[in-house]
Amino acid sequence: MRELVNFDSDERLRVSVEDKALVSVSQKSGKTKQSKKEFASETEAKKACAKKEWESLKKGFILQDSEAKAGKASLHVYIGGGYTGALSFTSVKDEIYVYKCGGQKDGDKHSDILVRLDKSGAIKEQIALPKPLAWHAEYASENLLLDLDHEIYIFEPNEAKFREILAEQNVKKSSEIASFICTSNDVAVFGMFGHIFTFCEGKISKFSEYKCSTKNYVPILCAALSADASMLALCTKENELQILNAKNGEILSELRAEFGVLDKIYFLDDETLLIRQYLENKLFCLDIKSAKVTKQPWIKDEYLRASEFCVEAGKLVVIDQSRGYAINLKSGNAMAEFRLDHVVKSCEAKFIDGKLAVRTDYGCFSLYEI
């Protein structure tokens, strides 16, 4: 059933289109109210229905659909405060933490926060961040790792406290302002100010360093961990990528090919990387042994411009602004083609419990069935 729920007022609202009419059914305190409004066409009625849902979301309602089919949203929560490039979120056990950009200061304090949701979409807590701009958020070893304006912090949910890694590890700020966080197998590797650390079982260890080249004055930096967290793929130069031992920093191989500047990489397996070209947003595969760049048959032309992509359990989702494509990596077959709601230009996407989780620049956090 698709309905809007307000946990604060205990109101439930269902909006639907019947022929050329918008039908609204509201339930609150045991009372039911129904209204019906006619429109000139079914198209106009559908537009009014979408507008009604959006207005309700902004008023604190949560959209839930227990019968959502593939490519459809089973959850919409209005978070607000979307900021292009900083749309981070991550899941922690049965909860989801979503970054919200406050966009203003209260005295000397920034109003940027982490919104803690349960799996029903109910907002349980809003946590003030020690710094603004959460560019990235990941989960490992029962902790959140946050890239706050290129400084890494660890948030311990059980203790409800932030750890400032810059001070803990006595890291000195440098001209290497680009940073990263990547996780796999409950291990995190992160980099800031030219230093690379691993975070495993609650312990932090430095194991390598990096120096970024630039392209059009923008630092080149992206990284990924292999499935077992034994290898780190690191790109800091145009047409060049290193594979490091993620425990001791040993360079296992250096790959050089005409793939340009990369801004996102992912280990498909121990021998293949899925890579995305900076600005072009084109997806390719890179063979780690031969350093050959290939376009696999499942990389269709219609989703070569990947503004976002994510992979889990043999499934690839490619997003081009508001269009989404789900692909079975084993067969190469398309599983679903769908449109994302509430996207202006960009979003961040991850898999959470088999569903596609999306944080959009228009202010929503959503779950889609895949």
Short names for language-model regions:
Residues 78-112, 132-133:
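Beta-strand-rich domains and repeat architectures in extracellular enzymes and scaffolds
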Residues 118-121, 156-160, 200-203, 245-249, ...:
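Short loop/turn segments that connect beta-strands within beta-propeller blades
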Residues 104-111, 147, 190-191, 235-237, ...:
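Short, solvent-exposed loop/turn segments at conserved positions within beta-propeller repeat blades
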